[in-house]
Every structure is written in C-alpha cells, then in structure tokens.
C-alpha cells in the first residue's frame, strides 16, 4: 500500500513538471511570434 502511494506522488511530481515545462515552451513560442509580428510591421 505504501509503495502504491509513493508511486502516485512520484507520478504527480513528474506530471506537474511536464505541465510547467509545456507552459514555458508555449510562452516562449508566443514571445517569438510576437517579435516576428513586430518586425513585419
């Protein structure tokens, strides 16, 4: 039982880190698009 709980906690930490990483990648892409948009004007 305790092993199962530990596995769930590890999975939660991994999935949270993945979500944060995706959010950073998305905001980085948005910044690049905005910069390119400003250059084209």
Curated annotation (Swiss-Prot):
Superkingdom of source: Bacteria
Protein's recorded name: SPbeta prophage-derived uncharacterized protein YosF
Species whose genome carries this gene: Bacillus subtilis (strain 168)
């Amino acid at each position: 039982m305790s092993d199962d709980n530990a596995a769930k906690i590890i999975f939660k930490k991994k999935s949270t880190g993945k979500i944060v990483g995706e959010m950073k990648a998305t905001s980085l892409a948005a910044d690049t698009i905005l910069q390119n948009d400003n250059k084209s004007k």
